[in-house]
């Protein structure tokens, strides 16, 4: 499945370059309107990131997420600033399908295990962001020495299924996904579902990832640059709806 991404900052839809909060491009001043366009196109899935929340360590763009949920009927996932159970509960009770835990999975694994046990692996997704195979946290502002494989292994053992793996150096660059990293992680953890994020340019990238067993991808800049279209995403997701 392909998830088009909407990144929220100061109430607007933006794109960052390599995760740099200072290097933003405004995509749409009204993210709800953008989500409505995705709904009309029938894409069936949407990836939201609360960038303000990632910096603040708590949900910030809650009202916008609520309005996006009302406008978009497909699978909706949200990440950014979800650091405690209250934040998890807030979004799931709002009707969001999946909540993404990134920093908290690294820094508070016990809480992460608790919410996986309570809500199940279809609703709790682990965000694994970083550079050179090591995990970054706190909106990518804090680069750790923890290998991605350690975090994924611990969370697989806790019952997690979905892992959104973002190569920070590829995000917003249109350089192509890090196929070697993603394919290697999927091969090491066949019971997990690795989701590609960062650098995806077009359907060919997505098909190459599929050959390595990575069947889910997130696209951002490629959509705004026109190298992949909403129509292509919609057709791809309908074709792969059984996955």
Region locations from a protein language model:
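Conserved, mostly hydrophobic/aromatic
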Residues: 7, 38, 46, 91, ...
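Conserved anion-binding
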Residues: 11-14, 18-22, 92, 96-171
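Short, acidic/polar
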Residues: 27-39, 83-89, 144-154, 206
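Glycine-rich, proline-tolerant flexible connector loops at the mouths of alpha/beta enzymes
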Residues: 45-61, 108, 165-175
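Glycine/small-residue-rich loop that forms an oxyanion/phosphate-binding "nest" at active or ligand-binding sites
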Residues: 52, 60-119
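Charged helix-capping and loop-helix junction motifs
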Residues: 59-66, 141-150, 175-184
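Catalytic cores of alpha/beta
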Residues: 72, 76-98, 180-216
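Glycine-rich phosphate-binding active-site loops on the catalytic face of alpha/beta enzymes
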Residues: 90-111, 169, 198-202, 212-232
